[in-house]
From Swiss-Prot:
Lineage: superkingdom: Bacteria
Residue numbers binding substrate: 28-32, 88, 102-104, 170, 264
Keyword Kinase: yes
Enzyme Commission no: 2.7.1.45
Pfam family, one: PfkB
Annotated residues for binding of ATP: 168-170, 228-233, 261-264
Organism from which the protein derives: Escherichia coli (strain ATCC 9637 / CCM 2024 / DSM 1116 / LMG 11080 / NBRC 13500 / NCIMB 8666 / NRRL B-766 / W)
InterPro entries to which the protein is assigned, alphabetical: Carboh/pur_kinase_PfkB_CS (IPR002173), PfkB_Carbo_kinase (IPR050306), PfkB_dom (IPR011611), Ribokinase-like (IPR029056)
Top EC class, one word: transferase
Protein name, entry field: 2-dehydro-3-deoxygluconokinase
Family: Belongs to the carbohydrate kinase pfkB family.
Activity response to pH changes: Optimum pH is between 5.6 and 6.
Amino acid sequence: MSKKIAVIGECMIELSEKGADVKRGFGGDTLNTSVYIARQVDPAALTVHYVTALGTDSFSQQMLDAWHGENVDTSLTQRMENRLPGLYYIETDSTGERTFYYWRNEAAAKFWLESEQSAAICEELANFDYLYLSGISLAILSPTSREKLLSLLRECRANGGKVIFDNNYRPRLWASKEETQQVYQQMLECTDIAFLTLDDEDALWGQQPVEDVIARTHNAGVKEVVVKRGADSCLVSIAGEGLVDVPAVKLPKEKVIDTTAAGDSFSAGYLAVRLTGGSAENAAKRGHLTASTVIQYRGAIIPREAMPA
């Protein structure tokens, strides 16, 4: 019987400059991960579900249609009257440096745990094999909704499920660094696999040797710690089994076009192997291969035919 992973988060409308024109697309860290997992697994082994809230507008419908086309199940995605998806604009200067502007305060995804359907959705999610979320999934919620989400994660683990967390830290989404540290600590205490981008760890906790970052995460109760270091090797530490250092795929500088979804796609490649019985080392190799392919194309979601074999 196929196992199930629910990816929890937010997808937004993306507006980006293309010469004198503005191009519209969709983007979101967890959505990127869900698509790249779905592209790399046999649905008979693992089905991918995306959990969020959208509006009843045409943009929301276009998102749903796109996700269906990627074999991402949306049966647990809510549609809310009088709500819309969030929006962000990417401005690119003459050197290629990007600046992001966000409009998301009233986005539907912020309220997915406050609806009449949320209790029934949580009841279903508590029986999933895997729940995946990121720091952004937590940041957009009210404190009350965060508590509900943490309760759901604990219940899922009590039922035999596993929780996967990507530390994706965006300071502008949080009231303070202290609040983030407190929430992340609670999150790690109910996490089985943690993906840590080292730059985000340094920004949130202060710069520390990577060994200390790994030890702190294990001490919170996380069994499997995956440290992402951009173009450098990744480190996988499994409690009781030791550390594996897996080299990245090296690309010539001119082949790197857009690093937008590098971390999201790495996590997807890793999980596509790991959650279907592969070793941590092979999972990390697949993560590197996926990320190194994705960054050779513009945009977060690359053409399906460009995916590695």
